[in-house]
Swiss-Prot record:
UniProt keyword list: Amino-acid biosynthesis, Aromatic amino acid biosynthesis, Cobalt, Cytoplasm, Lyase, Metal-binding, NAD, Nucleotide-binding, Zinc
CDD domains, alphabetized: DHQS (cd08195)
Enzyme Commission number(s): 4.2.3.4
Record flagged with keyword Nucleotide-binding: yes
Cofactors required: Co(2+); Zn(2+); NAD(+)
Lineage, uppermost ranks: Bacteria, Bacillati, Bacillota, Bacilli, Bacillales
Official protein name in the record: 3-dehydroquinate synthase
PANTHER family: 3-DEHYDROQUINATE SYNTHASE (PTHR43622), 3-DEHYDROQUINATE SYNTHASE, CHLOROPLASTIC (PTHR43622:SF7)
Length: 358
């Protein structure tokens, strides 16, 4: 399966298939320097795939291999500075391509390195997780600060995205469920039919763990995101809808140190409660609690914290404006809206969420 973005210029292919990594051979031919930024865990789990990637370069090219941790500890100024200095010491040129092999963290980090070193060099995303089907498309790259996630970054398109489905076969269930949250989010943005289809396909942990038919939903999720991003690349309008579940999600992720997708699913649940409170919707909260529990999401983490630190984190969200905290809420399935939510409603909704989960 292959998609091509439809921007006015600088379009790139998104290739989704088994053994997609072989496409690197042709893509890398124009470059003098090739830099692989690789998740150490991926190299350990699938050394033959990494070797396959490395063999795509020619003897005439300068190849650099940098191995980093595939978690949020990599997305720091310290690691960023270390990688930048190491590459500059290798005297890389503007005729360089950086290849990010790993999950969303690696894509975010390597993309930010590519966007900033020598005022920008090309990079290729090779996502190895389900979660990265979302982050590898759309051109957002960045690193974290002590104040929150992704607060330093850029909009910077890759040269290509190679989604090699072979990588998914080694994922633990924690990674599968984390990635599924973004796939499910895209279904909610699409409408009731898409929601019913995905909940029917993956009713419980056993079904999701099997990965059967997941590639179909990955493609739909990528297409959903592309349709929005191409219309609003720099998040001035509709692209904000892709942050469904992320305002509260980023806060609980940072506070409880849980996987991104698990936090997003909790954030989706929270926004249903806020929507019922603020928009007079009638979402069946117990339906979502039961469904998320069937998929083994750690909803109980909400009981391990209180509201004040979460509010402080939500107050730093990039979507906010001078009127306060902005959230993406569903007026109904498939109809998102960005709306200002006051602290009183946020706190009341948090208390309601905790009561549901006690």
């Amino acid at each position: 399966m292959e998609l091509m973005t439809t921007y006015k210029s600088n379009n790139y292919p998104i290739i989704i298939k088994n053994n997609a990594i072989t496409e690197l051979t042709e893509l890398l031919k124009p470059y003098r320097d090739v830099v692989f930024i690789v998740d150490k865990n991926v190299e350990f789990a699938l050394p033959e795939k990494i070797q396959q990637a490395l063999s795509s370069t020619s003897s005439e090219q300068f190849t650099h291999i940098l191995k980093v941790e595939g978690n949020e500890t990599t997305k720091t100024f310290a690691v960023y500075q270390h990688i930048i200095e190491e590459l500059l010491e290798q005297s890389i040129t503007r005729n360089t391509c950086i290849i990010a092999i790993g999950g969303g963290v690696i894509g975010d980090f390597a993309g930010f390195v590519a966007a900033t070193i020598l005022r920008g060099v090309d990079f290729i995303q090779v996502p190895t997780t389900i979660l990265a089907h979302d982050s590898s498309v759309g051109g957002k790259v960045g690193i974290n600060t002590p104040q929150g996630k992704n607060l330093v970054g850029a909009f910077y398109r890759p040269t290509a995205v190679l989604y090699d489905l072979d990588f998914l076969n080694t994922l633990p269930y924690t990674e599968i469920s984390s990635g599924y949250a973004e796939v499910y989010k895209h279904a909610l943005l699409n409408g009731e039919e898409a929601q019913l289809e995905i909940e029917t396909a993956f009713p419980d942990k056993k079904a999701l763990e099997s990965l059967v038919s997941l590639d179909k939903f990955l493609l739909k999720g990528i297409q959903t995101k592309l349709n929005i991003v191409i219309e609003d690349e720099h998040e001035q309008g509709k692209r904000k809808f892709l942050n469904l579940g992320h305002t509260f999600g980023h806060a609980i992720e940072y506070n409880q140190k849980i996987p991104h997708g698990h936090a997003v699913m909790i954030g989706i649940l929270y926004q249903f409660i806020v929507a019922n409170e603020l928009l007079n919707t009638q979402f069946d909260i117990m339906h979502y609690i039961n469904y998320f529990k069937n998929l083994d999401y750690p909803l109980e983490k909400v009981l391990d914290t209180n509201f004040e630190p979460l509010l402080a984190l939500m107050s730093k969200d990039k979507k906010n404006d001078k009127s306060g905290i902005q959230m993406v809420l569903l007026k109904e399935i498939g109809k998102p809206k960005v709306i200002h939510v006051n602290n009183e409603v946020l706190e009341k909704s948090f208390a309601t969420l905790q009561n549901y989960l006690k």
